[in-house]
Amino acid sequence: MNQRPLVIKLGGAVLSSIDTLTLLFKTISNYQQQAKRSLIIVHGGGYLVDELMAKLQLETIKKEGLRVTPKDQIGYITGALAGTANKMLQGQAMKNNVKAIGLSLADGGLCQITQLNPELGNVGLATAGDAKVLEAILATQVTPIISSIGITNDGELMNVNADQAAVAVATALDADLVLLSDVPGVLDAEKQLIKSLDSAQAEMLIHQAVITDGMIVKVRAALDAAQELGRAIEVASWRSPEKLAELFIGNSIGTQFQPQ
């Protein structure tokens, strides 16, 4: 049995679908009872941020799928991701008999955070840090739910792309990684699922504008993870929670990204 921890990145509109979250956490609960494998959830919550920005009448700007985060907005975004989104997921976990703890990338020095690009504002780049605290939590059989908010060594709050954050967490733990999103995986020009993809094939599809916008970030994060971890990384959909048990035991249900 594979005892390597599994990092599950949750993103997209899944946070707005209570029915899907119920099925997801029931699947996780059933799986953990059988497999005794450590699961870690890393999440974003872009739709919550979009809703908040609209209410505050603040403009949302994205560059290559990354949210531009002015310093005067990082407090709002931290509240939406590390607050509302994180506690909502923790609540759904508890409701479905999954013991959970809400964390951020900064807790216990789990990830090192630097500013990605000054033009993007308070957008951070996460790299693997010290996983000792997270490993101690996992030893208690509690499921960590980690928001994609990080803190630099200078104490600056940073909004980290959740896919990239999940890569850093998986690297810190030497864990397997699954990126769950709104889409079933990477689709070709005919909208058919691509079962397997390497870096050269992905760059060609980006050049051909088959892979666009936020999917570019997701694809590059998955390829980086595959390279860094030295094993295939999966991108799949959360829309079919009944298939996730297959994924947890190592069967592919989406697109697998291969290391070079």
UniProtKB/Swiss-Prot annotation:
Compartments it resides in: Cytoplasm
Binding site for substrate: 45-46, 67, 159
A Pfam family this chain is assigned to: AA_kinase
Descriptive protein name: Acetylglutamate kinase
GO BP annotations listed: arginine biosynthetic process via ornithine; L-arginine biosynthetic process
Catalytic reaction list: N-acetyl-L-glutamate + ATP = N-acetyl-L-glutamyl 5-phosphate + ADP
Enzyme Commission identifier(s): 2.7.2.8
SUPFAM superfamilies (UniProt xref): Carbamate kinase-like
Keywords from the named record: Amino-acid biosynthesis, Arginine biosynthesis, ATP-binding, Cytoplasm, Kinase, Nucleotide-binding, Transferase
Keyword Amino-acid biosynthesis assigned: yes
GO molecular function, one term: ATP binding
Record's keyword annotation contains Transferase: yes
Superkingdom per UniProt: Bacteria
One cellular-component annotation, GO: cytoplasm
Pathway: Amino-acid biosynthesis; L-arginine biosynthesis; N(2)-acetyl-L-ornithine from L-glutamate: step 2/4
Gene, per the UniProt record: argB
Enzymatic class: transferase
Task of the protein: Catalyzes the ATP-dependent phosphorylation of N-acetyl-L-glutamate.
Lineage: Bacteria, Pseudomonadati, Pseudomonadota, Gammaproteobacteria, Vibrionales
Entry's family note: Belongs to the acetylglutamate kinase family. ArgB subfamily.
Site, Transition state stabilizer: residue positions: 9, 218
